[in-house]
């Protein structure tokens, strides 16, 4: 079985019940999530051999965090244990015209304070086919940027396919710093995942004719973004998600895959959102699964978008649908009727 390694931070998520605001909350629901961990869970859920690499404290909350991955079948044996802090983030779910809000409390988390010598990449990459990371990981600290670069170099040396979701987070670093660091890291990447905001924020590449707030998405603009990214870094594939925001609850959702020659667009879904956190990660998980299982370009983008569409109907960061459910939606069964 093909093995995948995902590298990054896993955090505890605290959210008011339902659509409650932070200012109303007297209790919080506890779950766990993080961009790369969410991808690992998706892949394990599809029956793939997926491992997550990070540094997580040994205390009880850290163990609960690790157990959340084990429950979903993710290999946690490569996680470094130690440090004092587990990152925390708070999510207030939006409704109608009120947007969702996220507050991070992740400074000095164990993974951000990790040292290069704590990760033996020769051992971690033993028998591995695919390595996935996101732009969040090198943004956590200078050490993490150096560790991510070391991992990419070792993966490339071993012939491992490398994917990266640009995932720009302005609360972690500036556009200038992100552009400098990511430009070096992306030299090693085979598959780039992004949206139009990431491409603009990190590399100054803009999708002409697109205004996501107005729901205006230009296919030609997205094609140009993908081509510029591929030409600049030599990516074999560029996948770009297309989200049209109608309200906090209702979005149009689609994506495009560029293979260096042709652009393939998925069908468009109008989603009534239950929880959009992890939606992009479930797209990445679906993309990796499809590519590793020999799907053609059109099948790949349809599977990835359908997986992400379904995730956004599920509470929490983790996608919890089967391959058959994704294939059914990708094949046109979008009625939502009761299955008996």
Which role does the model predict for each range below?
Residues 162-164, 192:
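Hydrophobic faces of well-ordered beta-strands that scaffold small-molecule active sites
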Residues 10, 166, 282:
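Active-site metal-binding loops of divalent metal-dependent hydrolases
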Residues 146-158, 181-188:
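Catalytic-core regions built around general acid/base machinery
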Residues 49-136, 326-340:
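Conserved N-terminal subdomain of the carbohydrate kinase-like
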Residues 156-161, 233-236:
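A short helix->loop->beta-strand "cap" motif at the edges of active sites that frequently abuts
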Residues 1-74, 95-97, 114-117, 265, ...:
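Glycine-rich phosphate/adenosyl-contacting loop at the front of the ribokinase-like
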Residues 264-333:
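Conserved post-catalytic alpha-helical subdomain immediately downstream of the catalytic base
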Residues 172-259:
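Conserved phosphate/ATP/ADP-binding segment of small-molecule kinases
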């Amino acid at each position: 079985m093909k093995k995948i390694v995902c590298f990054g931070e896993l955090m505890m998520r605290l959210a008011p019940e339902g659509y409650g605001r932070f200012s109303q909350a007297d209790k919080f629901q506890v779950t766990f999530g993080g961009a790369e961990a969410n991808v690992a869970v998706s892949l394990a859920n599809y029956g793939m051999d997926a491992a997550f690499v990070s540094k997580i404290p040994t205390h009880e909350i850290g163990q609960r965090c690790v157990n959340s991955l084990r429950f979903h079948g993710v290999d946690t044996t490569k996680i470094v244990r130690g440090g004092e802090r587990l990152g925390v983030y708070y999510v207030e779910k939006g409704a109608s015209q009120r947007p969702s809000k996220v507050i991070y409390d992740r400074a000095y988390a164990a993974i951000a304070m990790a040292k290069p010598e704590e990760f033996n990449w020769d051992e971690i990459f033993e028998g591995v086919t695919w390595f996935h990371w996101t732009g969040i990981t090198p943004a956590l600290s200078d050490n993490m940027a150096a560790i991510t670069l070391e991992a990419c170099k070792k993966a490339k040396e071993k012939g491992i396919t490398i994917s990266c979701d640009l995932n720009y987070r302005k609360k972690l670093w500036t556009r200038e710093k992100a552009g400098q660091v990511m430009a070096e890291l992306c030299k090693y990447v085979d598959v780039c995942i992004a949206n139009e905001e990431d491409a603009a924020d990190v590399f100054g590449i803009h999708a002409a004719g697109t205004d996501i707030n107005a729901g205006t998405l230009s296919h030609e603009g997205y094609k140009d973004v993908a081509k510029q990214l591929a030409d600049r870094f030599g990516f074999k594939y560029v996948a770009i998600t297309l989200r049209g925001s109608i309200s906090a609850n209702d979005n149009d959702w689609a994506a495009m895959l560029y293979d260096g020659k042709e652009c393939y667009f998925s069908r468009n879904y109008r989603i009534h959102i239950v929880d959009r956190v992890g939606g992009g990660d479930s797209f990445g998980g679906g993309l990796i699964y499809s590519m590793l299982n020999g799907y053609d370009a059109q099948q790949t983008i349809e599977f990835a978008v359908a997986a992400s569409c379904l995730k956004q109907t599920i509470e929490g960061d983790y996608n919890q649908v089967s391959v058959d459910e994704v294939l059914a939606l990708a094949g046109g069964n979008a009625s939502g009727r009761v299955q008996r």
